[in-house]
Amino acid sequence: MPLRLIFMGTPDFSVPTLLELVAHGHEIVAVYTRAPKPGGRRGLQLQPTPVEEAARRLGVPVLTPKTLKTEEALEEFRAFDADAAVVVAYGMILPQAILDAPKLGCYNLHASLLPRWRGAAPINRAIMADDAESGVMVMKMDVGLDTGDVAMAERLAITDTMTAADLHDRLSRLGADLMVRAMAALDRGGLQLKKQSEDGVTYAAKIDKAEARIDWTKPARAVLRHIHGLSPFPGAWAELAGVSENARVKILRCELAKGSGAPGEVLDDQLTIACGEGAIRIIELQREGKARMQATDFLRGVPLKAGAKFT
């Protein structure tokens, strides 16, 4: 029979799991998400999270507490009398009392193959580290940072064409299906848990904008993975030497290419750029204050020739 679930999530990544749980008949008794933030052109409108927008379309009660550590927050959580809580990129630490409240526990969907890439930015870090694969895992939560016992996992190969946005979307859909399967097993009493290994633990630190500048002295493959791991946000960038306005360019998608030259040197009229070893060809980019565009469109307005330089 369907479970009574509390859903806790915030960004776009979380929404498919919420929708799939509803589609498979589970009763979502409440949705917890982060409070709306100022948005719009002038920051004058409060913008609800993607999860809040989805929950309101479903007619599910939405809560946006600033903390879950008060007695009032705990009593409110307990009052929903949930069988379990499903947590997908909620963005707030759950205290032990909250974790203990649902009858069957709290279950988190994490976008990595734990224990690799515990923490805030597993999708970006997996690409930037040149990992061959990523994946999603469902774990029963404890008070540690992504240290809970693992219930289920699905793997996904990372290709050289994948950006962080591409991998995000693939894992979001894969994770939604995995959580549905996990809740079905939990409902049957057949969800088996396995402790995480203490070998191979790495931490996916939050992305800092200071990391975004491209180091052209690195090998082409490392440059490609750096670019794709930061696409679209915050966007890996370089500056076009000799350009007085809008010199900064975010590179959003590229491919490995043949060629050699001084790091950052433009090698031809197709935006092939030399790296410390090998070269990349830019496919998609964005100038400061402009919309993202294909490299071919950029070259119509800025006809770069061989010998130009990115720094």
Swiss-Prot record:
Keywords: Protein biosynthesis, Transferase. Its EC number is 2.1.2.9. It is an enzyme of class 2 (transferase). NCBIfam families: fmt. Gene3D superfamilies: 3.40.50.12230. The keyword Protein biosynthesis applies. The keyword Protein biosynthesis applies. Attaches a formyl group to the free amino group of methionyl-tRNA(fMet). The formyl group appears to play a dual role in the initiator identity of N-formylmethionyl-tRNA by promoting its recognition by IF2 and preventing the misappropriation of this tRNA by the elongation apparatus. GO terms for cellular component: cytosol. It holds the Pfam family Formyl_trans_C. HAMAP family: Formyl_trans. Belongs to the Fmt family. It catalyses: L-methionyl-tRNA(fMet) + (6R)-10-formyltetrahydrofolate = N-formyl-L-methionyl-tRNA(fMet) + (6S)-5,6,7,8-tetrahydrofolate + H(+). GO terms for molecular function: methionyl-tRNA formyltransferase activity. (6S)-5,6,7,8-tetrahydrofolate binds at S112, L113, L114, P115. This is Methionyl-tRNA formyltransferase. It comes from Bradyrhizobium diazoefficiens (strain JCM 10833 / BCRC 13528 / IAM 13628 / NBRC 14792 / USDA 110). One of its GO terms (biological process) is conversion of methionyl-tRNA to N-formyl-methionyl-tRNA. InterPro entries: Fmt (IPR005794), Formyl_trans_C (IPR005793), Formyl_transf_N (IPR002376), Formyl_transf_N_sf (IPR036477), Formyl_transferase-like_C_sf (IPR011034), GART_AS (IPR001555), Met-tRNA-FMT_C (IPR044135), Met-tRNA-FMT_N (IPR041711).
